[in-house]
Amino acid sequence: MKEKIILIASWLCVLLTMVMIFCFSAEDAEKSTQTSAGVREDVLDTGLPDEQVTPELVSKLQFPFRKMAHFGIFMLLGFCLSNAFERTIQKKWYISYPCSLICGILYAISDEWHQNFSFGRGPTIKDVLIDSAGVLIGISVFVLFIYIFNSIKAKKSIK
């Protein structure tokens, strides 16, 4: 019963991440810019003194912040997909990780296509590549966590 609940929770995390991505992609260009500007300003306010946060700096960092947001949210998706597929296709990493990558890339493509319907926005191959890289890194982080967890578990069982 516990495993079934964890499996459902794992897929729920995937679904919630996908919904979050969908909602961000549904924003028109102006709203999307405001959202990322708010986050960017919060980060800059936290990391730099007020006198160093100039309008030029804020403007200069707009593009990198937006791309890091793309990368980060798709990294989360890759991690969640890996967890869900790992629990669904137990002990078959050679199936679960490629499935995670394929699903993540397909979602990145569909996300860019979806942006085509949001006013002032459009799809770019660059964003698909950034999103796909995020998925791949998310899967890699998950694999690393599993490796570390299994190593610790094995050491405890030896003692």
Spell out what each predicted region is:
Residues 3-8, 90-98, 121-125:
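Membrane-helix interface segments
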Residues 11, 97-102, 128-129:
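Hydrophobic alpha-helical transmembrane segments
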Residues 16-21, 96-116:
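Small-polar-interrupted transmembrane alpha-helices in polytopic inner-membrane proteins
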Residues 63-77, 125-136:
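Membrane-interface loop-to-helix entry segments
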Residues 73-88, 133-149:
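Membrane-interfacial alpha-helical segments at the cytosolic side of multi-pass membrane proteins
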Residues 108-132:
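Interfacial helix-loop-helix junctions of multi-pass membrane proteins
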Residues 153-159:
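Membrane-interfacial, low-structure loops and terminal tails that flank and connect transmembrane helices
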